[in-house]
Regions:
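Active-site C-terminal subdomain of aminotransferase-like
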Residues: 2-70, 85, 154-156
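Short amphipathic alpha-helices in soluble, non-transmembrane regions
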Residues: 105-114, 143-149
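Short, flexible, solvent-exposed loop/turn segments with mixed acidic/basic and small polar residues
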Residues: 48, 82-87, 119-122
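Conserved PLP cofactor-binding pocket of PLP-dependent enzymes
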Residues: 114-132
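Conserved PLP-binding catalytic core of the aspartate aminotransferase-like
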Residues: 80-111
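Short amphipathic beta-strand starts and helix->beta connectors
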Residues: 73-80, 111-117
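PLP-dependent enzyme catalytic core of the Aspartate aminotransferase-like
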Residues: 126-156
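Short beta-strand-to-loop capping motifs
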Residues: 3, 96-100, 132-134
Length: 156
């Protein structure tokens, strides 16, 4: 930034420290090193979202993926039971329980054998947690649902 020193010295005090020119003037531009890798990664993610239709398209895709998995839970005749109330369900992390902890352990083991890793729930909550973040394709969610149905039929 090229500016008169008197202008830089009179930064409004209500402006956050990191956004005030006088902060950097007093510290010879060395007040803080920006998190370069984090900034780089945010740029990559934003570019990817734009290339894939933008936020509206991403929201539609995520809603469709979540619906697919939640429908498998809701239509399982009680074999799978969701943790969250229907009006509070996440589009990113679908959590559910099985009839017993033994079946949950078996589900996690067999899911891994079918290429579906990381489905074990949080240690304080238990059950299953399937993460279907933005980059997870619909095909991955369909593979999960297919496995869930196969597992349910074999273990009901």
């Amino acid at each position: 930034v090229v500016a008169r020193k008197s202008f830089l010295e009179n930064s409004p005090k209500e402006v956050p420290t990191m956004l005030r020119y006088d902060t950097y003037l007093k510290k010879n531009s060395l007040y803080n090193t920006p998190p370069a890798f984090g900034i780089y990664m945010v740029g990559k993610v934003v570019s990817w979202i734009k290339a894939n239709g933008g936020l509206e398209a991403m929201a539609k895709k995520n809603a469709a993926k979540a619906k697919l998995v939640y429908d498998a839970i809701d239509n399982s005749d009680g074999f799978y039971v969701g943790h969250a109330d229907k009006d509070s369900r996440s589009f990113m992390n679908v959590t559910f329980r099985l009839p017993s902890e033994e079946l949950e352990a078996k589900f996690a083991k067999e899911a891994l054998e079918h290429g579906l890793g990381g489905v074990k729930g949080h240690r304080s909550v238990g059950g299953m947690r399937t993460s279907i973040y933005n980059a997870m394709p619909m095909e991955g969610c369909q593979a999960l649902v297919d496995f869930m149905e196969k597992f349910r039929k074999a273990n009901k």
